[in-house]
């Protein structure tokens, strides 16, 4: 079971990734974790990565693909893997295909932009305890105050509407074209199978749809 999970920030990918990896006994592979592990291991590739990162550069697709090919030969990938946050661009998707890395399923968690903005921009946090509220879906008893201490709740910078909209526009320009790429590939070659799952409803309902698509 080799899976690529796509979806905008705030679409609920992290939650679904956890269910998929537990259900199928496969690791979740994120490029960030992989790059950090390579640097820590000090392998020749890792040293290359460290050089690029230390100089503030972006790690090239060639290096990332080489790391992925290395990573998926490890024992925990015997039953497959789930790519999280990769590929992000068409050149990365093409490089993955050219490298002979086969993918069984591409799952897109599709959620309307306005729904994502409402989900994220409505979050309020109590900094001291980490308690999270939502102005609509899980409001505090007194608006703007923590239920336990009565202290002020804050909105994190990352959760502000303009930040969320900026991240969504980056997603649409960079990653959304991957949806078309994999839809066309699926239609032409029959693999990977492409599934668009509506990421609305309860977590359980979305998980049921995702697992049914993968089974």
Swiss-Prot record:
State the UniProt keywords alphabetically.
ATP-binding, Cytoplasm, Kinase, Nucleotide biosynthesis, Nucleotide-binding, Transferase
> Which InterPro entries does the record cross-reference, listed alphabetically?
Adenyl_kin_sub, Adenylat/UMP-CMP_kin, Adenylat_kinase_CS, Adenylate_kinase_lid-dom, P-loop_NTPase
| Recorded catalytic activity of this chain's protein | AMP + ATP = 2 ADP
Q: Where does AMP bind?
A: 31, 36, 57-59, 85-88, 92, 156, 167
In terms of Pfam families, this protein maps to: ADK, ADK_lid
Report the subcellular localization.
Cytoplasm
Protein origin, superkingdom: Bacteria
- GO cellular-component term (any): cytosol
Q: Where is this region: NMP?
A: 30-59
Record region (LID): 122-159
Binding residues for ATP: 10-15, 123, 132-133, 201
What pathway is this protein said to act in by its record? Purine metabolism; AMP biosynthesis via salvage pathway; AMP from ADP: step 1/1
**Recorded GO terms, molecular function?**
adenylate kinase activity; ATP binding; nucleoside diphosphate kinase activity
Keyword Nucleus part of the UniProt annotation: no
Keyword Cytoplasm in the entry? The reply is: yes
Indicate where this protein is primarily found: cytoplasm
User: Which EC number(s) are documented for this chain?
Assistant: 2.7.4.3
Protein's GO biological process:
AMP salvage; nucleoside diphosphate metabolic process; nucleoside monophosphate metabolic process
NCBIfam families the record matches: adk, PRK00279.1-1, PRK00279.1-2, PRK00279.1-3, PRK14527.1
| Annotated family | Belongs to the adenylate kinase family.
Q: What's this protein's function?
A: Catalyzes the reversible transfer of the terminal phosphate group between ATP and AMP. Plays an important role in cellular energy homeostasis and in adenine nucleotide metabolism.
Entry remark concerning the domains of this protein:
Consists of three domains, a large central CORE domain and two small peripheral domains, NMPbind and LID, which undergo movements during catalysis. The LID domain closes over the site of phosphoryl transfer upon ATP binding. Assembling and dissambling the active center during each catalytic cycle provides an effective means to prevent ATP hydrolysis.
Q: What is the protein's quaternary organization?
A: Monomer.
Q: What is this protein called?
A: Adenylate kinase
- The species this protein was found in: Pseudomonas aeruginosa (strain ATCC 15692 / DSM 22644 / CIP 104116 / JCM 14847 / LMG 12228 / 1C / PRS 101 / PAO1)
